[in-house]
Regions:
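S-adenosyl-L-methionine
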Residues: 109-162
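Conserved beta-strand signature within the Rossmann-like core of class I S-adenosyl-L-methionine
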Residues: 174-183, 187-188
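Flexible, glycine-/basic-rich loop-and-beta segments that form/coincide
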Residues: 237-239, 243-271
Length: 271
């Protein structure tokens, strides 16, 4: 498991505006692990880079900081999930599920290939159907009692090209999708740098072009693009795509790709 300095990780996860602030914050004992509350007070200490951190005493808005990704997408793309049946593909601890519930979703299918990851408070919620050890690429309409009209996708170690065909089978016509594009799982192996990090803006641009073209081919119009407000594993920049299932799908973001990638790289240039 790759490791990262506590102060760098705290900065990357958005707890502080600068690395210097993060360093001082760690030394002051302000940074703790979300999972078990362990406190870190040595900025240079190296911990697993997938350790989720928070500020001491901070009440997280969602069960996972990852929920901030979907929150941004719903706000920026003007999507409402109120009263809808939805799917959270790659639910993990349930950050996206939590966002959907807090925004009025009627029912959420929380789907994940793993087991025992979904937060306890979500397991206990009658509006959540937990579908563990479920490989969504083989999903069929009959797997879902209610037809979903919204889906989020946040998957790792698998390309969206294996998820979208299954989602097309399951999702209602005109159903909306927020898909997290993770270049590190879409690019060719030769394009991925040390520790699984992609820093080349050209690779990001090519990945987004490929994924959006593939989405159209699978019957989804591409209506919007943005970058994730927080970085993914190992510090990778990730992107948000707004899709809609349509009979005559089209790509409406072609001209936005290059400016968006440039903007994302400016935003995270010191990471």
């Amino acid at each position: 498991m790759p490791k990262e300095r506590v102060d760098v990780l705290a900065y990357k996860q958005g707890l502080f505006e600068t690395r210097e602030q993060a360093k001082r914050g760690v030394m002051a004992g302000l940074v703790v692990a979300v999972l078990n509350g362990e406190r870190f007070d040595k900025p240079g200490e190296k911990i697993a880079d997938d350790t989720e951190l928070k500020l001491k005493g901070e009440k997280l808005k969602y069960v996972s900081r990852g929920g901030l990704k979907l929150e941004k997408a719903l706000e920026n793309f003007g999507i409402s999930v109120e009263g809808k049946t939805t799917i959270d593909i790659g639910a993990s601890t349930g950050g996206f599920t939590d966002v959907m519930l807090q925004n009025g979703a009627k029912l959420v299918y929380a789907v994940d290939v793993g087991t025992n990851q979904l937060a306890w408070k979500l397991r206990q919620d009658s509006r959540v159907v937990s579908m563990e050890q479920f490989n969504f690429r083989y999903a069929e309409k009959t797997d879902f009692e209610e037809e979903p009209s919204f889906a989020s996708i946040d998957v790792s170690f698998i390309s969206l090209s294996l998820i979208l065909p299954a989602l097309h089978r399951v999702l209602a016509d005109q159903g909306q999708v927020v898909a997290l594009i993770k270049p590190q799982f879409e690019a060719g192996r030769e394009q991925i740098g040390k520790n699984g990090i992609i820093r080349d803006a050209k690779v990001h641009k090519n990945v987004i072009e490929t994924v959006t073209e593939m989405a159209v081919a699978e019957g989804f119009s591409v209506l919007g693009l943005d970058f994730s407000p927080i970085q993914g594993g190992h510090g990778n920049i990730e992107f948000l795509a707004y899709l809609r299932k349509e009979e005559h799908a089209s790509n409406q973001v072609v001209s936005e790709i290059e400016p968006l990638v440039e903007k994302a790289h400016r935003e995270f240039k010191d990471e």
